[in-house]
Amino acid sequence: SALKYFLENHTTVKKQQCINNKTGKVIKACVPMHTFGRPCRIDEIKEICDKHYVFLIEDAAESVGSTYKGRHTGTFGQVGVMSFNGNKIITAGGGGCIVTNDKALAKKAKHLTTTAKVQHKWDFNHDMVGYNYRMPNLNASLLVAQLENLDNFISSKRKLANVYETFFNSNNYVFV
C-alpha cells in the first residue's frame, strides 16, 4: 500500500518515533478513512502503524455499523471518530463521537468536550481550553431513531460505491 511504501522508504524509526527523512518531522498519526460503508484494509494499516509507532485514528463516519473481519470499523486504532453531519450514513444534523478503549484518552476527551471544567462545588476553574461539544438531547434522539434502519442506510451507500466503482473502472481509473 502507499502508506507502507511511504513509511518504509521515506522514514526512520528512532526512539519509538517515526521520522520523515525529508523534513525531519515526527509523523504522529495516520487517519485512514472507511468510505461508503466499505472498510479499508485496516488490519494492514494498523500493522504498519504499530511497526512504525504511528498513532492510528480511524475516520469511520462513512462506515458506521460496518464491520471488517467481524469487527466494527473505528475500533482497530487507538481512536475512532464518526461524524453525524447531514451527508453521513446516519445524521443528527451535526456533531459526532469519539470511540476508544483507552481509559486515559476517553477521560481526556470527555474533559475537553465538557468545557474542561475542574470539578468543584462552587469554584469555576478550567484547566485547559475546552469547548462545549455535547450533543443536545433532541439531536441525539434523531440519531438513535435511525439505528433501526442502519442496515438499509449502509446498503444504500454500498450501492452508490458500486456505481462509482463501475464508472471509474470503465474509464481506466482505479477505485480503492
What are these regions (language model features)?
Residues 1-2, 13-44, 54-83, 89:
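Conserved PLP phosphate-binding loop immediately N-terminal to the Schiff-base lysine helix
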Residues 5-8, 13-25, 29-32, 42-44, ...:
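PLP-dependent aminotransferase class I/II
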Residues 75-114, 137-140:
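Active-site PLP attachment segment
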